[in-house]
């Protein structure tokens, strides 16, 4: 598995956009009633192969979203995109959320639902087939999608692992 480290990507140099995936209102019961808080899942990306996600928690919605964006910028990964799609099929699991992603031919479009769609849009993938199985919890679905995108190996990674040139990889 080719793991792209978030350490060597500088989010300040990227033109990152953000997309809100989910807002959840939480309630803490105290002596005087209920105290409400909010958490927000935000996906950030430049639509050119960089994507990250963040979770923000605060007493106000706007503060939670801002914290989520900041957290997302710290977790940016690089996704290898080949002709608007991914190089190979992936099945990733996080908790009981399972996400299956298949490469598609140009013109197919982004066939994904909910949280997975937000991740793929921000990554800049235009043609892909996906299916979300198991839990539909947005937290775990986003994490499974990111985990899957992080595990993608392109031809350069395979050549590096095998100590072969790009030409030798395609011949074997």
Curated annotation (Swiss-Prot):
Per UniProt, residues of the S5 DRBM domain are: 16-79
Q: Does this UniProt record's set of keywords contain Cytoplasm?
A: no
Q: Which UniProt keywords apply?
A: Ribonucleoprotein, Ribosomal protein, RNA-binding, rRNA-binding
Keyword S-adenosyl-L-methionine applies:
no
User: A single GO BP annotation from the record?
Assistant: translation
Q: One GO molecular-function annotation for this sequence? A: rRNA binding
**Pfam families recorded for this chain?**
Ribosomal_S5, Ribosomal_S5_C
What's in the GO CC field?
small ribosomal subunit
The entry assigns this protein to a family as follows:
Belongs to the universal ribosomal protein uS5 family.
Q: Assembly state and interactors?
A: Part of the 30S ribosomal subunit. Contacts proteins S4 and S8.
Reported function? With S4 and S12 plays an important role in translational accuracy. Located at the back of the 30S subunit body where it stabilizes the conformation of the head with respect to the body.
Notes on the domains: The N-terminal domain interacts with the head of the 30S subunit; the C-terminal domain interacts with the body and contacts protein S4. The interaction surface between S4 and S5 is involved in control of translational fidelity.
State what protein this is by name.
Small ribosomal subunit protein uS5
- The source organism is Pelodictyon phaeoclathratiforme (strain DSM 5477 / BU-1)
């Amino acid at each position: 598995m080719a793991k792209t480290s978030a350490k060597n990507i500088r989010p300040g140099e990227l033109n990152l956009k953000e997309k809100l995936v989910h807002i959840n209102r939480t309630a803490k019961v105290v002596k005087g009633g209920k105290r409400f808080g909010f958490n927000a899942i935000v996906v950030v990306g430049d639509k050119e192969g960089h994507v990250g996600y963040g979770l923000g928690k605060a007493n106000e919605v706007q503060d939670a979203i801002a914290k989520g964006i900041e957290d997302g910028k710290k977790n940016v990964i690089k996704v290898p995109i080949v002709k608007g799609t991914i190089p190979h099929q992936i099945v990733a699991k996080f908790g009981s959320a399972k996400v299956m992603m298949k490469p598609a031919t140009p013109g197919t479009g982004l066939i994904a639902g909910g949280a997975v769609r937000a991740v793929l849009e921000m990554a800049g993938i235009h043609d892909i087939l996906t299916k979300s199985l198991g839990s539909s919890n947005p937290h775990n679905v986003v994490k499974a999608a990111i985990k899957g995108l992080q595990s993608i190996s392109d031809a350069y990674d395979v050549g590096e692992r095998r100590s072969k040139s790009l030409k030798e990889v395609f011949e074997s």
